[in-house]
């Protein structure tokens, strides 16, 4: 039997699922097949990044930590495996079944009245990690979610951002892995699916701390990372796996690894996963994964029709529904001071520049509507000696990872970004959230401002820029139980650098090109806004918009409304706000 067919047979034996036909297998040779050359896997969701060593440094740190965890586990488990298997190493390597047939025997758990982690009667190893992380009292989602999850219940949870749900799902699954004595050879027992790479990295970091004293393995697979290295680790055995949907489906279909023992599936930020176009991938993932005795926990900030459909196919009948926000007066967290400022279109950049200059010692996140807008403003601000970091979806993964951790570790500074940073990310000590471009609807607003005032005793402030024609958005925020007040920024305190800006843009070829791209993308984003009754492109003064980008006259760019319909397709079916996308009207605003 040749090597490829033997690996397919081994994969089938381990999981009862055949590798996808017509694609190369990213198989990892076993110890008896060292001389056989490995087949290169074909990327499924994003191409592998083969850029410079400097760009790979950020992800390398995560990979090194995962490698070290694997080494520690192998050393810790070697004696136990010899004892349990009677010293038969070959049998231990090939036997992927769980001890005791995978029967879960967790200690009695505390009821909903438990207030502290101590009352949950968790394992000594988990409690030691929680104490080292300085957690004592539970948040509401933890108090209501952890006990039933420890008991094996399926959970459908709704909680606002910053509520502590990461611990709410990680603690129960780690306890389960420990109770079942999972080892690398048993394969993957828990999969956590996250919408974005940054959120997946963040969950991975929390899992690493919680599992510091446990012997089980953990790992992460995300788009843009080294797929071959991921496949090798999966073949060795990753008990707790954090993943983004596209890369997870890729490995499930093309990488031979053991997942027949899967006991728990966690879907975090389910509404966001569906919003960004991973509905088909999630359906395929759920279809491939074992269903028998599998616990599923699904968390979503909003309960849309698509989320309900996903819950229906993934959860067992009679799940526990937890909504910690239904009785709250406001949809945003306490300790958050929220406001807006009315600003003429041509003054928007000057106001932003003046605000950032006055708050150089603060930690600030500024949200823009498109990648090109982020790129232009980052290049411009850094060029004029106002240092900022930038984060958006068109960057290479190494760059995104490096920027994310650099800003997390910074005590002060400014990050300008798209909504890639708006969901779930726990960035410490953010003082201000600036929404330079308006969000697509109140739900996105809530997630943006959720990057500050996180935790039980933290404070934070947010500021939204609104043009005079956009004030109708305030009524939508009010309907969504979001309290905002008008802020004033004295005109005399605005630093007028308009003439210098226009001179710079006219003379610097690269900034001019970047400004033109930003202008075009801003108009496209505005044209495809879901709340078109409020954000009407026909009401924009294009001369003022151009001026805010540093042009004396609107540049000659095609900003056909129909050109933005690809973005509309991503929005359709997920928005409860605003009108349906318009048909291609063929209107052009070309200068």
From Swiss-Prot:
Its main location: nucleus. Residues 45-92 have a biased composition (Acidic residues). It catalyses: ATP + H2O = ADP + phosphate + H(+). Residues 1-11 have a biased composition (Basic residues). A motif (Q motif) lies at residues 115-143. Residues 146-321 form the Helicase ATP-binding domain. InterPro entries: DDX18/Has1_DEADc (IPR044773), DEAD/DEAH_box_helicase_dom (IPR011545), Helicase_ATP-bd (IPR014001), Helicase_C-like (IPR001650), P-loop_NTPase (IPR027417), RNA-helicase_DEAD-box_CS (IPR000629), RNA_helicase_DEAD_Q_motif (IPR014014), SPB4-like_CTE (IPR025313). It comes from the Eukaryota. GO terms for molecular function: ATP binding; ATP hydrolysis activity; RNA binding; RNA helicase activity. It is found in: Nucleus, Nucleolus. ATP binds at residues 159-166. GO terms for cellular component: nucleolus. Keywords: ATP-binding, Helicase, Hydrolase, Nucleotide-binding, Nucleus, Ribosome biogenesis, RNA-binding, rRNA processing. Residues 335-495 form the Helicase C-terminal domain. Its EC number is 3.6.4.13. The keyword Glycoprotein does not apply. One of its GO terms (biological process) is rRNA processing. A motif (DEAD box) lies at residues 268-271. It is an enzyme of class 3 (hydrolase). A motif (Bipartite nuclear localization signal) lies at residues 347-363. The Q motif is unique to and characteristic of the DEAD box family of RNA helicases and controls ATP binding and hydrolysis. ATP-dependent RNA helicase involved in 40S ribosomal subunit biogenesis. Required for the processing and cleavage of 35S pre-rRNA at sites A0, A1, and A2, leading to mature 18S rRNA. Associates in the nucleolus with the 60S and pre-60S ribosomal subunits. PANTHER family: RNA HELICASE. Belongs to the DEAD box helicase family. DDX18/HAS1 subfamily. This is ATP-dependent RNA helicase HAS1. It comes from Gibberella zeae (strain ATCC MYA-4620 / CBS 123657 / FGSC 9075 / NRRL 31084 / PH-1) (Wheat head blight fungus). The lineage of its organism: Eukaryota, Fungi, Dikarya, Ascomycota, Pezizomycotina. The gene is HAS1.
